[in-house]
Amino acid sequence: MLLAAPGSASAAASPSPSATPVTYKIGIGQDYDGMNPFSSWSGISWESFRLGYDFLTWYDEDYQPAPDLATSWETSPDARTWTFHLRPGMKWHDGQPLTARDVAFTYNLILDTQTPAYIQYLTGVTGVTAPDDVTVVITTRKPNAGMLALYIPILPEHVWKKVDPDHLDTFKNMPFVGSGPFRVTELKKSKWVKLEGNPDYPADLGGPPAIQALYYVISQNTDSMIEDYKAGNLDAIVDFPATYEKVLAAAPGTTAVAAPAIGFHELAFNCWSSPKSKGDPLLRDAAIRRAVHWAIDKEKIDATSMAGQAVPGTSLLSPAEGAWHWDVPAADQYRYDPEKAKQLLEDAGYTDRDGDGVRENAGGDKLEFRLAALNEYPEDLAAAKMIVSWCRDIGIKLNLDQKDEGAFGDEVYDNADYDLFIWSWGGDIDPGFMLSTFTTRQILNWGDSQYSNPEYDRLYVRQAEALDPSDPGDTSKRKAITDEMQKILYRDDPYIVLWYNVNLQAFRTDTWRGYDQVPAGNGAPFWNYMRGTYTGLRPVSAAATKPGGLPAWLPVAAIAGVAAAIVAVVLVRRRPRAVEDA
């Protein structure tokens, strides 16, 4: 079964009341941005949702659809009616029963409000009903190729029915009520997120976790975080700069991995043509975007800012997504060629008319733009500085603006107040979500390049419906369409994919066992879309659960009595809204 854990979970998870809680702490450089699944976008928030909520279906370790709330399902002969059978006896964290009504409520809430956070998953869905407590029936206008990849946390109707549908994205969602193996119980901005194990989690989904208190410990100082890890005050750290990987690998009792991951780091352009856009209108010209692409040396970025650990990017979907990645033919790939970049700009009418080194258009508007990069990600800042230099060489002036991630998220998603930025995506296992972020309906929502292309929009609908009822497992038709969509994006350059994500994680193997590395053997144990590590970890000895030294950046009073241990991270970006943090 999915998420099966070794050993006896119930015995490990039920110590006497006086025993020290079994505690695990994970160090991470990114802060959370709330616990509202309709508006939060940070990696910590979404890893908490994966642990705190259940989903209709999930994935096995080969990233194939597998049971979660639903134990089985079948389709009608025309693949337009899907019937899901839920596991009985599931409960919410507050003890209320979880039934098919909650699933239907969640999906219908999304359909009724058309919330951009999830509506792309329900493309073509015409109805969701719950004929009884353990049956969900979904009907679609046409076959839906992503029906087993609905990345939508199932919400408790008895909590969310009280929320004004027009203000879903401002609900704090604390106390947190989910059904997963962990429950979010405490938030301390810029300090930590605390989750507690669910003692009632079903055995066939991994059972109650042995970890009773799980902390994501937040630090903006990589050096101090690594020193605390080496001192035994943290059990794992994640998403650290690539230059630290060898240092951590040499630490006693440590395994360090640099595993290929879904997603990428990108240079994005503000392509929005609306009068509301606050981006420079010159960037709507694809010739400028293509010239910038030719001016970038991705191999040097990898060698310099990623210590050679990453793979330079080409098409949108990463190689970690298997067959969905479009392998760009060698003859069509952008290569570092500043002379070609200059010629593209010349041909498009951009010349240096006043001799100051910056090109202008015929009207005298200079190719001078803002480039935002985030303080939280030193590898992005390093790449940004190189890109500024390369663009200067071809007559484009970029003014580097270092930002904090939280404030910058508001500028991008709520106001479109930017020209270019470097940031990252985690993506989904199924290609539908990532491709949806370039559809017109996602402008000022997930679509942070504000890109619009009617041809691309039509292809998005076609790929979602590319399911052969006679052979639902055949993805060849959908693959052909998603390849075409990636070709369009590679041609139009709303994004320049700089490099594909690498899961950089270090974790203690001398004090903990049960790490579930995905892919098996050399993959990452955390941020791998699986819950197996969280439900399967067991302390090697009582020493692993004793209170240890405190991370240097945390106040002692705030974490007194908490034992040492943590989990790992690959950041997933999600759409922000005006959610107040606890």
Where does each model-flagged region fall?
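Alpha-helical secondary-structure segments
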Residues: 25, 99-106, 133-139, 180-181, ...
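N-terminal lobe/hinge region of extracytoplasmic solute-binding protein
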Residues: 27-77, 108, 177
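A structural "hinge/loop" feature
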Residues: 29-49, 69-71, 96, 118, ...
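Gly/Pro-rich hinge or "lid" segments in bacterial periplasmic/extracellular proteins
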Residues: 60-64, 153-208, 213-215, 223, ...
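Extracellular/periplasmic solute-recognition and catalytic clefts
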Residues: 110, 127-129, 185-196, 215-276, ...
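Ligand-site clamp/hinge motif
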Residues: 170-173, 200-247, 383, 388, ...
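Detector for C-terminal structural segments
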Residues: 188, 192, 197, 260-265, ...
